[in-house]
């Protein structure tokens, strides 16, 4: 038991350290001008415009409205002016809501849509920068050897139309799985006493999976292999996702969304440049153990996804 606990802690710390290896982002951006451009666009939209707008609102607009339309009277204010305090509070609240409805919420949606498009480009350019670079050939060889066992999935997938259909099916299932897992994360957060702890843990796994999914997509690793590898090495990925969650866990939804939109591509690039297969295998060789065992992280999401797909299959013939 003590040996297992040490293994969990070491793998968690290894994952945490990998996520914090942000120097890889600088190296990859220096190798690829396209990557630097996309990353800069992401920082401009989410950092300067989105997060900057929230800062201007909090530190300038809101205090100014508090001063112009106060809801409490100072001793020097006339009684006639004070009689409008309730109306001023209502008017100020309405103006604040207008800012949210016509600026922050549309900006949030724009950021969400563009960022998701840019994230894929960032991961692709980062992956290409690693592949074509000969400045770090030893690292490329190390990752190539580590991914060899996982890339065996490519041989199992048929070519032609059959392979395309399997790929589409995997994408549909993956979307359903991650959607239900996200809902599970939200529901777990309202559980008394232990809800916040479970929410933090599930969020860590969710962000870690998102970060590595880009790399696995470009590596051609099948969905089954990804899920098996992820759930078999849950301690490492819990550690990798922890810095992502720590950065936003105690912030308001809009601020956390803006900050995560800035940080997420950095963690994606960190995941793209990392080799978790060898990092995870090192402790096993040191302790001569088989690993921690598979943890069914996606069990609930998988059950709901299969249920949704079975309902869809039953309804389709009936409609025809």
Curated annotation (Swiss-Prot):
Localization terms from the record: Membrane
Topology of this chain in the membrane: Multi-pass membrane protein
TM ranges: 41-61, 94-114, 175-195, 227-247, 248-268, 292-312
Swiss-Prot/TrEMBL keywords: Glycoprotein, Membrane, Transmembrane, Transmembrane helix
Keyword match Transferase: no
Known glycosylation sites: 217
Major localisation: membrane
Pfam families documented for this protein: EI24 (PF07264)
Gene Ontology CC entries for this record: membrane
Superkingdom, taxonomy of origin: Eukaryota
PANTHER family: ETOPOSIDE-INDUCED PROTEIN 2.4 HOMOLOG, P53 INDUCED PROTEIN
Family: Belongs to the EI24 (TC 9.B.7) family.
The protein's name: Protein EI24 homolog
């Amino acid at each position: 038991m003590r040996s297992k606990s040490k293994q969990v802690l070491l793998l968690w710390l290894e994952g945490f350290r990998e996520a914090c290896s942000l120097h890889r982002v600088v190296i990859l951006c220096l190798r690829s001008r396209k990557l630097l451009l996309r990353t800069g666009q992401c920082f401009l939209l989410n950092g300067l415009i989105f997060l900057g707008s929230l800062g201007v609102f909090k530190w300038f607009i809101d205090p100014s409205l508090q001063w112009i339309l106060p809801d409490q009277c100072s001793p020097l204010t006339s009684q006639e002016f004070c009689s409008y305090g309730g109306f001023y509070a209502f008017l100020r609240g309405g103006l604040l809501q207008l800012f949210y409805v016509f600026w922050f919420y549309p900006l949030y949606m724009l950021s969400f849509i563009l960022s998701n498009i840019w994230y894929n480009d960032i991961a692709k350019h980062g992956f290409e920068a690693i592949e074509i670079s000969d400045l770090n050939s030893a690292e490329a060889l190390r990752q190539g050897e580590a991914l060899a066992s996982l890339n065996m999935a490519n041989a199992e997938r048929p070519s032609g139309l059959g392979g395309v259909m399997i790929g589409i099916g995997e994408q549909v299932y993956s979307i359903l799985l991650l959607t239900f897992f996200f809902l599970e994360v939200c529901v777990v957060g309202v559980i008394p006493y232990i809800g916040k702890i479970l929410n933090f843990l599930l969020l860590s796994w969710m962000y870690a999976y998102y970060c590595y999914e880009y790399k696995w997509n470009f590596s051609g690793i099948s969905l089954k292999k990804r899920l098996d590898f992820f759930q078999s090495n849950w301690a490492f990925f819990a550690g990798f996702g922890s810095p992502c969650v720590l950065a936003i866990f105690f912030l308001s939804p809009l601020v956390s969304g803006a900050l995560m939109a800035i940080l997420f591509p950095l963690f994606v690039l960190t995941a793209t440049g990392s080799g978790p297969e060898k990092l995870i295998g090192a402790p096993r060789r040191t302790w001569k153990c088989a690993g921690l065992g598979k943890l069914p992280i996606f069990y609930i999401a998988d059950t709901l996804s299969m249920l949704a797909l079975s309902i869809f299959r039953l309804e389709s013939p009936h409609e025809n």
